[in-house]
Amino acid sequence: MRVTGGIARGIQLRVPTQGGVRPATDYIREAVFNSLAAFVPGTAVLDLFAGTGAYGLESLSRGALRATCVDERIGTDLTANAAAVAKSMGLAELPFTKITGDATKPGVAEGRFDLVFADPPWELWQTKGAEIAA
C-alpha cells in the first residue's frame, strides 16, 4: 500500500498484519482522489474509520492544509505512516491529528471540515450503516 499522488507519492504505508484490517486499495484511493483533485488543496480533511490513515495522509500529500484521523484503535502503523509522509514532504511534523474514538458518534472530532472520508469496515457498515450515513 502506498501514497498514490502528491508530494509523498510512492511512499509505502504500513498495514497491520492482524485484526482483519483491509484498507481501500491504492487503485480505489487513486480513483477517488483523481475525481476530487481540484477540491483537495487548501482543505481541512476528516478521515473517519482511519485505520492506516491512508485517506488523511493522501490528502496532505495532495495539498490539504490539515487532516484529522479518527479510529477506535489508533495503532503504531498510523503513527509510522504519518512520520514517513512527513519526512518525504520535508516536514518535521504534519498538520495531522489522531483521535481514538468511535467514528459513528457525532462530535467525535471538533472543528470544521471541508472533506470527510468515511470508509468503515464492511461488517460495521452492515450493522450500523444507517447510523453512519446519518
Across the structure, where does each feature detected by a protein language model lie?
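Class I S-adenosyl-L-methionine-dependent methyltransferase catalytic core
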Residues: 1-134
